[in-house]
Amino acid sequence: QARREKGRLRITPCADDSPPQAFLGVRPCDLHAIEVQDRVFLKGGFVDPVYRQRRERAFIIAINCGQPCATGFCASMGTGPRAASGFDLALTEIISPSRHDFLVEVGTDKGAKILQDLPHRSAEPREVEQGEALICRTAAQMGRKLDTAGIKELLYDNYEHPRWDDVAARCLTCGNCAMVCPTCFCHTLEDLTDLTGSQAERWRRMDVCFTVDFSYLHGGSIRPSPRSRYRQWLTHKLAAWMDQFGCSGCVGCGRCITWCPVGIDLTEEVRAIRESQAS
């Protein structure tokens, strides 16, 4: 907030009074997405104070995937189906004809403290093996795969590939894929003033690179076509992200595939480009 008082401008940050939050049932791919967001908001040149406060106060209970989701490919990205880190507690659900149990893995001191107050017992070796077998079976049954070998160079070298025209003919530029992606962080800023001009507020809200206005500079948009906007999104996610943050921007959750109204599948788009190069 900015306020003009006695000829001087006073700028004050808005206090974040949100309560601590607990996230239940967080999937392994989303744990990796949170780690990616940490790189963006906590480990760059500038730290986001609001994100940092909420992140430090969050309590995360993850759940390992006991069956593959319809559009996920986390096994290809190395982000699932087992939670490796980033959780306070991680659960593995084991269902048999006679029992319904949860294996619990402690990830932090906060998680250990919570577990102390809950009835539990030490897992038997056979139960641990049963949980691991369930997770391995999930990985083997995953229906989609993405070949990530040399993917950055593949996309950089095919910036003018005709496949971009093919996908642009189908893409509605609705932005669904970016809005449901757990690693997309783009936003816009809006300045609001009162009628007297003595007070102003700056609000940050989510935005997506599929809108024409997102890349608007003086004179017009630098990405005026669906081709250029989809190419930017996919190339940034799978290639440029590695240069910026040292990791992929895709965690293989498959939400972009699920929520695309015309059925665009990024794994198929990458495969088509790769196969054309091999032929």
Give a label for each model feature.
Residues 28, 178, 257:
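Short, flexible micro-motifs
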Residues 34, 182-186, 261:
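Active-site-flanking alpha-helical
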